[in-house]
Regions:
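Positively charged, low-complexity nucleic-acid-binding target-recognition regions
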Residues: 175-186
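Core catalytic lobe of class I
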Residues: 1-177
Length: 186
């Protein structure tokens, strides 16, 4: 939360807040005086209104049913109108992913980093907030998950990382990543 407040003090706008929920978080231990840390914030910050929003859609639970809507006319009388519901709806702002070996990535080298991001989380965020050919910037590249998914989704990537060890992990992951023959559209 402090990061969002800091960037807002620099003139960025907080456009959206989402939650990354870990289905199988690392246990805190019996002697710990706090609950298991099972979620993290995802902040979408921008200088202006975001130019891109490609929401992840899911089939609406009751999309096949009509809805009765009340509407009060100018004369004060209540009118009931049957309307068609949308067949699809945007997903909730809580994104749940399993983490750890066999879940976050199949790249064994990535686990040399202590806190890797699930590839599906990176894929979902990149697909939502960018278009094909856009540039993705990750100021904390870590094990290179954002870099890998950006390139597989046909985005350009720029990143920074202080640790030369983590830069080497990223380099190896990108060298091993399959080349996208067919690019996904949004």
């Amino acid at each position: 939360m402090r990061q969002a407040l800091y960037f807002m003090s620099l003139g960025f706008r907080l456009h959206d807040t989402m939650i990354y929920a870990k289905k199988n978080p690392m246990p805190a231990g019996v002697s710990s005086k706090r609950y298991h840390q099972a979620w993290e914030y995802i902040f979408i910050l921008s200088k202006d209104a975001p130019e891109t929003f490609n929401p992840i859609m899911t089939k609406a639970k009751y999309g096949h049913l009509g809805a009765n809507m009340k509407h009060r006319g100018r004369d004060g009388e209540m009118n009931y109108v049957k309307t068609k519901r949308n067949e699809y709806t945007k997903v909730r702002n809580i994104f749940e992913y399993s983490v750890g070996g066999g879940h976050s990535t199949k790249d064994k080298i990535a686990f040399q980093h202590p806190a890797i991001m699930p590839e599906q989380l990176a894929r979902d965020m990149i697909s939502t907030w960018t278009n094909l050919g856009d540039t993705v910037f990750d100021p904390f590249t870590g094990s290179g998950t954002t870099a890998k998914m950006s390139l597989l989704l046909n985005r350009k990537f720029h990143g920074t990382e202080l640790s030369s060890e983590y830069c080497e992990i990223t380099k190896q992951r990108l060298e091993q990543a399959p080349t996208a023959l067919f690019y996904e559209s949004n």
